[in-house]
Amino acid sequence: GRRMKNVAKDFEKSRDFLICIDSDGCAMDTMDVKHMRCFAPCLVHEWDLGEYRDDIVRLWRKINLLSRSRGINRFKGLAKILVEINENYTRVDGLDELIYWVQTTDELSEESLREAYERTGCNCMKKALEWSRLVNDSIVMISNSRKSPFEGVEEALKLIKGKADVVIVTASNGQEIRREWEDSGLMEYADLLLSQESGTKEMCLRSLTEHGYEKDHVLMIGDAPADKMAAESAEALFYPVLAYQETESWEEFAEEGLKRFLEGTFAGTYQEEKIKEFYANLDL
C-alpha cells in the first residue's frame, strides 16, 4: 500500500550487505511469555471461553509456537484459532467478516482493522480490536527482565556492525518492539525498524532489496517458516534461529554464518543444511 513506499524511501543503503532480523522468538526471548501470558489469556477473556481455557491455551500455543504458522501476525493467528473454536467449541459471531478482512487487507494492523470495523460494524471485528488492545496493555505490564534478548544476540550484532546494514523486520506492533530493543540497549545496532504498520514481511523485504544490493548480499534471520517464505519471495538468503536452541543458533551465526555470508559461501550447501535442521526442529 501507499505507506510501504514511504518506509522504504526513508532507508539509505550504506553498506554492500543487508541483514534483516526478526524480533520475537528470534532476537528477543519474548515469544513464550507473550503468547502464554498475554495473547492466549486475553483471547479466553474477550470471547468468554473460560470453560475451555486449557484447550484454548494449548491450541493457541500449537498454532503460534509449535507449527508451520509459528510467528504469524496476531490477526492471522486469531482468525485461525477462531475457526477451530467456531467448529469445535462454541459459535463465533461475525467470524466470516473477520476472516475476509484478514485475507484481503493490505495491512494487518489495528488501524486497518478499526477502519474495517467502522465500515462494517461487525461484532467479531470489534472483539478482535478489543483483544488486540488488551494484549498490548498486558505486554507492557510484563517486566523488562522477561523481555530480554537471547544470549548470543548482542555479540552477533557487534560483529555485524560496520559490515552490513541492519533492519529489524517484525510482524508485531512497532512501538512495542522498538521499546524492547531500546530497553535492552540493542537499538543502536539497527538502522531501521519495519513492523506490522509498515506492511507484510514480504513487502518490507522486497522494498529493502530494491536499494541496490547485489544478489546474495541480503540475508533474513528468523525463527519461523513465514520468515523463510518472506526471504524467498524477496530472493534473499535465510538463516534460521531454532526454537529452544536460540543461543546455539546465534553463536553459530557469529562463528560461521556471518563469515560465509560476507565471503559469498552461504548460499548452497550451508544454507540447505541450516534449513533442513530448521524444519526438523519444528517437526515439519
Predicted regions and their residues:
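Short amphipathic alpha-helical segments and helix-helix/interface helices
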Residues: 154-158, 205, 228
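Extreme N-terminal starter segment of soluble prokaryotic enzymes
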Residues: 15-19
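Alpha-helical substrate-recognition element adjacent to the catalytic core
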Residues: 14, 26-175
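Short, basic/aromatic recognition patches
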Residues: 5-10
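C-terminal accessory extensions appended to soluble enzyme cores
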Residues: 255, 259-284
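Substrate-recognition "cap/lid" segment bordering the active-site pocket of phosphatases
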Residues: 167-219, 229
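Short, Lys/Arg-enriched N-terminal segments with co-localized hydrophobic residues
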Residues: 1-3
